[in-house]
Amino acid sequence: MQLNGSQIFVEVLCEQGVDTLFGYPGGAVLNLYDELYKNADRITHVLTAHEQGAAHAADGYARATGRTGVVLATSGPGATNLVTGIATAYMDSVPMVAFTGNVPTSSIGKDGFQEAYIEGITVPITKHNFTVRRVEDLADTMRAAFRIAQSGRKGPVLVDIPKDVTAAVCEFTPKQPEPIRTVTTYNEEQVHWAADLINAAQRPLVYFGGGVRSAASCQPLRDLLHKAEIPATHTLMAAGVVPYGDPMNIGMVGMHGCYTSNRAVADCDVLIAVGTRYSDRVALKPKTFAKNATIIQIDIDASELGKNVDVDLSIVGDAAYVLNAMLPQIKPAKHPDWMTMIQSWQAQDYHPVSDPTRLMPHQVIGEVCNQCGPDAVYVTDVGQHQMWAAQYLRHTKSRGFITSGGLGTMGFGYGAAIGAQMALGRQQRVVMFTGDASFHMNLNEACTAVSYELPIITVIFNNSVLGMVRQWQTSFYGKRYSQTDPHRKTDFVKLADGFGLKGYRCTNLPEFQQAFAEALQRKGPTWIECIIDKDEKVLPMIPGGGDINDIIME
């Protein structure tokens, strides 16, 4: 059948199972938006306040579901406003397809109105990108973009579509989506060797990251831990893969991980790293990381093997397939001496002391868990509040904690929460933690939450400073607070009212308990501002370039 480019665009989106699209219209994509208008019963378009918010929303949608998030923006500044969101998804291996409009093909390279070379700009932050110069290529290019985003190590793909391509006509043939290409192969000899090392270990430790969540390999990982009594530590991106309360889960590792996890890495004799890249927030001193251990690394991306830390055995493969192949070769085991040692370290973990005269982050987060129960989805911005949430939330769901890990994008949270809420439905409880500085970045997305009546509860830790940077200045820069005390006078309660939502301000725990209970009953979005001390710190902390011997506990 004969269709124009805009009709093909919608047909392929539907063919790929896209039900929700985040974006912002403009001149170069008006043809696409006209077709979306005609197909509003097939695809829900979510209009955000800013293209960056749309990109983060597509990201949040993908993280909450595992499906590909889709974002659409116009040419020039519309496209460049997506860049931070695309880079955020790239660093955390999130499947996303970003569509951008462009000037007509005859005008490309002539510095026309709202022209930007978005294909070149995004080369370092996408798995692949395309510029479609013929309408005949549009359908297959879109299909390739979705396939690439979900295949192997997941990530974002950009498709740039000049305006004349959206109006041109060609023959279109519908196709069924191709199965996602999964890496099912692995080296059986290496898997056997890994099993032998694990079976012989006296102090084994599993260290897992977000790649386990992406590989849908949570259950075989848990089976391994319990079959051989192996304690496990995780990165920020893997919170919830092994639930809170599981005796094998000893907590987060790294710069703001717990004492036990960091001590266990230093003292284990076999370290099994699964779906993690040894980032500099975990392997702070790469040359001595797990220095007493034989290190096994399992990853779907061969380029990550041994990239940051020298390993003894590298296995390329999807974690689910590798772990399932390894499990029958693992002997049931107990490690009583090792577990006793772990328990002795747990007695030394940092536990904040509550102060009844003020509101403290761990109290707030604990109360949120008490009132929400185990099924909530938590989203964060970036800063101290992100680390407090990682440390004190009772993570029970593999996709229940959404945060920007690799890029550390301040302003990520509200857009991501909108995407998660749209993906999971209004009946799903979504709570977003932010700080006053991070929230200032993209709080304009409040209008989106209001427009779509999304019951997102936003908890704002307000210490009136740039908390994480200021903490570093306190510890390492002689308390020289350069540009971290902004002296802002933002009234978040009045601002909430201006956006058309309910806002609260709390200075003690009873006030927060009441405000949060009321927020749970509301149908639309709510902000709860929590006034905390500007000297509140994220502890423990291992300085960059340090190790367990440098840990700061007070």
PLM features: residue spans?
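Active-site diphosphate/adenylate-binding microenvironment
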Residues: 9-10, 14-19, 27, 32-37, ...
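Thiamine diphosphate
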Residues: 99, 107-109, 113-114, 306-308, ...
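Well-ordered beta-strand positions enriched in small/hydrophobic/aromatic, beta-favoring residues
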Residues: 69-71, 159, 378, 401, ...
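Active-site nucleophile and cofactor-binding loops and adjacent substrate-binding regions
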Residues: 24-26, 45-56, 71-78, 133-134, ...
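Phosphate/pyrophosphate-binding active-site segments
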Residues: 136, 174, 292-384, 509-514, ...
